[in-house]
C-alpha cells in the first residue's frame, strides 16, 4: 500500500495516509476520506481537514457540512511508515489554518 505523508505549513510531519485512512505518526487511526476526494473526517465523522498540494493537511475555515459520512470498518494498525523528515515551509492557502488535533482525534 502506498503511504502519503502529510505535513503542516511549517513542514512538520503530522500524519500519513494509507489507502482511504489517515493515521498519526504513531500509527493511531485519526480519520478517513469517505468521499473519495481530499476531505478528511475524524473517527467521529467530523471534518478534520483537506489535503492540499499532495502532502499538506490544512483545515478549511467555514467548510460546508457534507452530512454524516457513516462509519467505516476499523482499519487496524498500519505499521510504522518510517520518519519522512522535514518538508519545508509552505504558506497557508487563504481561508485555511493548520489542523488542530484534539485528544479525541489522536
Question: Residue ranges of each PLM-predicted region?
Answer:
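Short "repeat-start/strand-capping" segments in structured domains, especially the N-termini
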Residues: 2, 17-21, 35-39, 55-56
Amino acid at each position: 500500500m502506498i503511504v502519503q505523508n502529510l505535513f503542516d505549513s511549517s513542514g512538520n510531519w503530522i500524519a500519513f495516509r494509507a489507502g482511504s485512512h489517515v493515521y498519526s505518526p504513531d500509527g493511531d487511526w485519526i480519520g478517513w476520506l469517505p468521499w473519495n476526494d481530499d476531505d478528511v473526517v475524524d473517527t467521529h465523522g467530523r471534518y478534520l481537514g483537506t489535503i492540499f498540494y499532495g502532502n499538506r493537511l490544512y483545515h478549511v475555515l467555514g467548510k460546508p457540512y457534507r452530512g454524516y459520512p457513516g462509519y467505516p470498518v476499523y482499519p487496524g494498525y498500519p505499521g510504522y511508515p518510517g520518519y519522512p523528515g522535514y518538508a519545508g515551509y509552505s504558506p497557508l492557502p487563504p481561508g485555511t489554518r493548520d489542523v488542530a488535533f484534539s485528544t479525541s482525534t489522536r
